[in-house]
A protein has these predicted regions:
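Extended, highly charged
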Residues: 1-272, 277-287, 291-475
């Protein structure tokens, strides 16, 4: 099932018992964020949350944790809620191969029902804003998609980027935005500022789950998130034209903000509790001026809690990081079997591969660090053999404990790039990277004194299936 907007997704969650409606009166702070934080502390299957009785807000409707469990993630892909995580990733990979799927242009988007322009804009009136963590420097929009175009190639649909970036609400029509240098919007801004220009952008709030997943997925520079969204949802993705910028935006969004990143202008932004589980601190960041707002009547506001894992962002970013890394590595190294980059947006990746020759696994690890995502995120790689499942942590721990000799199996790479939000980097944005080779050596590599590894007995698979069926029949 493909969801054209947030509302149809929420209805599907409700139908599956995965939307918890909280009718009692709550405070915007700290209740909304604390409840979302709590969903990551109550075990598997946490629901999405719905609030419509918020003290101090008139008729505000807020939803959080919409993709904050593997059940909800499965529903977002149109899969049964009990679909195992590995099968969800396998399905993600299968659908990826359908790229590109041309989007469907639609008229009369619901977000065109109401508009506000120029100095009449007051974001504090339109959006029910609240802080997510006690140390945040202000109100943040953190689950929105930002649309930008390459200023030197404006008509190239593939170079129109859709990405998720945090934005601090700093005034009635002013935002602070952090363009991470490794992301496409940073390149768009660089090109605009070289020409002495502002960079037009459109900001979409309250989106369907698939474009949200795509906004968190590291695609190549000329790959369209809308075309990949169509592949992932297995039907053309619906888009409409934003009235001020003329950009392509999701047809089903709740709110559209249009304006510009003001060229060569920076102001202090932050601090903000980030996906790393740490506050990022305050830094000089870009300034956004909002010139037009379009919104549905009674819009639904969606926000994302970030903090110590696991929270919703880990479910959102995990598969969306594993799959592109796998696809990019598999295209160059067919021996690669699987990639687990579920942890902190891929700052750690576990990769299983066959080996053609000695040192091969390390070469794969190096390539992972130089993919578009790896340049800014993949800080540590654990390489394992093809018979080790990267998603089975006991197997990974076995490989680490039995196959690694620290004297020669740790490859340290000094002064490499990483996103500035990595709290371990020093200075911010520079770090040493590490490859841990937990594979069995092949010629001419002569590490260790390995004998033949113990394999499962040939009959084990059949017995596993038989025992599983017997247990199921006993219930």
């Amino acid at each position: 099932m493909a969801f054209d907007d947030l509302r149809s997704f929420l209805q599907a969650l409700d139908d599956q018992g995965q939307l918890l409606k909280i009718s009692e009166e709550v405070n915007a702070e700290p209740d909304l964020a604390a409840a979302a934080n709590a969903t990551g502390r109550i075990g598997d299957g946490a629901p999405a949350l719905w609030f419509d009785n918020i003290r101090g807000f008139n008729d505000a409707r807020v939803t959080m944790n919409t993709i904050g469990s593997w059940q909800n993630h499965a529903i977002s892909l149109g899969l049964p809620p009990n679909t195992p995580v590995k099968k969800q990733i396998d399905e993600f990979i299968r659908r990826w191969d359908n790229f590109p799927v041309t989007p469907e242009r639609r008229a009369n988007p619901a977000w065109a029902e109401n508009t506000v322009d120029g100095d009449d804009i007051n974001l504090f009136d339109i959006l029910p804003l609240f802080r997510l963590n006690d140390g945040d420097g202000g109100f943040y929009l953190d689950k929105v998609c930002v649309v930008s175009r390459d200023p030197l190639d404006k008509d190239n649909f593939g170079k129109q980027n859709v990405g998720i970036y945090r934005m601090e609400v700093k005034g009635k029509r002013k935002l602070g935005l952090q363009p991470v240098p490794m992301h496409d919007i940073a390149l768009h801004l660089h090109k605009a500022e070289e020409r002495g220009e502002d960079l037009p952008i459109a900001i979409t709030l309250g989106n369907d789950p698939i474009i949200t997943l795509m906004g968190a997925t590291p695609l190549k520079y000329d790959q369209s998130e809308y075309e990949m969204a169509g592949a992932l949802r297995e039907s053309p993705y619906p888009i409409a034209i934003a009235p001020l910028t003329g950009f392509d935006v999701p047809w089903g969004s709740e709110v559209i903000l249009e304006g510009v990143i003001e060229g060569r202008k920076r102001e202090i932004e932050g601090p903000f509790g980030e996906f790393t589980g740490h506050y990022s601190g305050g830094r000089n960041m870009t300034v956004v001026r909002i010139d037009k707002v379009s919104y549905r009547s009674k819009p639904i506001f969606e926000s994302l809690y970030l903090g110590m894992p696991w929270t919703e962002i880990d479910y959102l970013m995990g598969p969306a990081t594993c799959v592109p890394l796998y696809q990019q590595l598999k295209a160059e190294f067919p021996e690669v079997q699987a990639v687990n980059a579920m942890y902190t947006h891929g700052l750690l990746a576990i990769i299983s591969t066959k080996k053609r020759y000695g040192g091969f696994a390390r070469a794969v690890g190096l390539r992972a660090m130089t993919t578009p995502h790896g340049l800014g995120y993949v800080k540590m790689v654990i390489m394992v053999d093809e018979d080790v499942d990267p998603f089975n942590l006991p197997q990974v721990m076995w490989a680490l404990s039995s196959k690694v000799n620290p004297a020669g199996d740790l490859v340290q790479l000094p002064n490499m790039s990483v996103l500035e939000l990595d709290p371990g980097s020093s200075p911010a944005g520079i770090t040493d990277k590490l490859i841990i080779d937990a594979t069995t050596p092949v010629a001419p590599d002569l590490r260790g004194h390995y004998s033949q590894p113990v394999q499962d007995l040939p009959e084990t698979k059949a017995w596993a299936e038989k025992l599983t069926a017997m247990l199921a029949n006993r219930k």
